């Protein structure tokens, strides 16, 4: 299976998906707009997909790997989890909360 996310010319997530996002993409000072995820090559017979976005670079800052996002119940027929799926309500999946 292969996943792809949009990266800028430096190989980083674009600012709109991180701490430099614009005010309309923030809640309580934190970015809330999830990046799109392209999915391909899902194994035949898969019944469901799950994802986790774990930030291991946070260990020196807070002492543990920060889990930014966890979700399950994604259809194996999904080719694209759209931008802002975490908040738009337009994409069917179950999300974890922290």
Named regions from a protein language model:
Residues 1-98:
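N-terminus-centered regions that define maturation/targeting leaders and the start
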